[in-house]
């Protein structure tokens, strides 16, 4: 087991772990050893921290992409082509962790679900369970029936426009709920967004089938 040293008199501060290569101290979130320069394995950290973003639902999309692309360049396989097999494997694991983090944070639904998990709320979205909210289930059923009854591309387009507006409203509701630290409201809005996305995808498929 790696020994963790924490710098900071009050228990806060930077955590250091031994470098796998030279055993020198390495900041827990550092990509490379400060002493020997060896790339370090991805530590146990949240997706926001991994990408250098402050935890929260409202993110600067341009900054998120810039951070991601910057780390991607640092972890590009060409940079490690001449390194030993272990370093190449570690670089690959870092890239996998980076891609996973970006995949979550770049998607508002996944980001909101992940943020709820960080706050101790396991949404039905995360567990892919049937939603237990009767009102939401009824609303979803009614919308799917309306889609089933739609017999023209124009009717489907109208339904999609209405649902796209609902999805945008869900994003606004999620943002406000997290700002107010109302996790119950955030979870409800996340579930509504899940159903909106599912309906929109089904509508796109039906429209494509009609037009083919």
Predicted regions and their residues:
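C-terminal accessory/regulatory regions appended to core domains
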Residues: 1-212
């Amino acid at each position: 087991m790696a020994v963790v040293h924490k710098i900071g008199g009050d228990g806060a501060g930077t955590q250091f772990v031994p470098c796998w290569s030279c055993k020198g101290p390495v900041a827990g979130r550092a990509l490379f050893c400060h002493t020997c320069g060896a790339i370090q394995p991805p530590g146990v950290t949240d997706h926001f921290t991994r990408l250098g973003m402050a935890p929260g639902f409202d993110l600067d999309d341009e900054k998120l992409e810039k951070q991601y692309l910057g780390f991607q360049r640092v972890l590009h396989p060409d940079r490690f082509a001449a390194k030993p097999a272990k370093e190449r494997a570690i670089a690959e694991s870092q890239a996998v962790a980076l891609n996973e983090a970006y995949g979550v944070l770049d998607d508002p639904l996944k980001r909101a679900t992940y943020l709820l998990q960080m706050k101790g709320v396991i949404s039905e979205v995360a567990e892919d369970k049937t939603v237990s909210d009767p009102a939401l289930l009824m609303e979803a059923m009614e919308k799917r029936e309306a889609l089933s009854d739609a017999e023209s591309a124009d009717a489907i387009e109208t339904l999609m426009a209405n649902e796209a507006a609902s999805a945008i409203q869900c994003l606004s509701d999620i943002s406000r709920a997290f700002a107010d630290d109302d996790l119950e409201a955030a979870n409800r809005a996340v579930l509504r967004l899940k159903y909106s996305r599912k309906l929109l995808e089904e509508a796109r498929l039906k429209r494509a089938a009609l037009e083919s």
